[in-house]
Structures are given as structure tokens and as C-alpha cells.
Curated annotation (Swiss-Prot):
The keyword Repressor does not apply. It comes from the Viruses. It is found in: Host cytoplasm; Host nucleus. Assembles into oligomeric complexes. Interacts with host CDK1. Interacts with host SRPK1; this interaction may favor expression of late viral transcripts. Interacts with host cytokeratin components KRT8 and KRT18. One of its GO terms (cellular component) is host cell nucleus. Keywords: Early protein, Host cytoplasm, Host G2/M cell cycle arrest by virus, Host nucleus, Host-virus interaction, Modulation of host cell cycle by virus, Phosphoprotein. Residues 14-54 are annotated as: Disordered. This is Protein E4. Residues 39-53 have a biased composition (Low complexity).
Length: 88
């Protein structure tokens, strides 16, 4: 059964989850043209190829939590969502 605190505060589930993994790239085996493997695609992929760090940070002080989610759009815009959660 789910933890009552998680049901009451569904965002708390984010504290224990890892970010989704990016899709794996398919390996093209048996291609006769080796140069085609090393060519850069003309379009930018819609998902990152690797995630160096989690897209969110969690700070905890006494009874309060701060969850910050930072993402970048394809157009280069940075979006930051910051949630201040406090236990009453």
C-alpha cells in the first residue's frame, strides 16, 4: 500500500525517483558505407543523448524542502520551476 504522505503530497514521489533514461541509439551493423556512421545528423535530436546530472535538485532544511526543476527548450530557453514545501 502507498505511503499516506506520498498520497497526500504526490510531488514527494519525485524525491525518490531518478530521471528517465534517454532512448538508446540503434547500431547499424553490416553497412557497406562506413562514412555514413560518422556523419552528424542534420537535425538536432529531440532528447538529450546523455544526462550528466539529474534535472532537479532537492534542498532540505529543518522541516522545509525545496525542489527545483531546470529544463532547456530546443530554442534555448531555460525554464526553472522551484517548489517550496513545508511540513506543518
Amino acid at each position: 500500500m502507498d505511503d499516506p504522505e506520498v498520497i497526500k503530497y504526490p510531488l514527494l514521489k519525485l524525491l525518490t525517483q531518478r530521471p528517465p533514461r534517454p532512448p538508446t541509439t540503434k547500431v547499424h551493423r553490416g553497412q557497406s558505407d562506413d562514412d555514413s556512421i560518422y556523419q552528424t545528423p542534420e537535425t538536432t535530436p529531440s532528447t538529450p543523448q546523455s544526462i550528466q546530472t539529474a534535472p532537479w535538485t532537492v534542498d532540505h532544511e529543518e522541516e522545509d524542502y525545496t525542489v527545483q526543476l531546470t529544463v532547456h527548450t530546443k530554442g534555448g530557453t531555460c525554464v526553472v520551476l522551484k517548489f517550496h514545501l513545508s511540513c506543518i
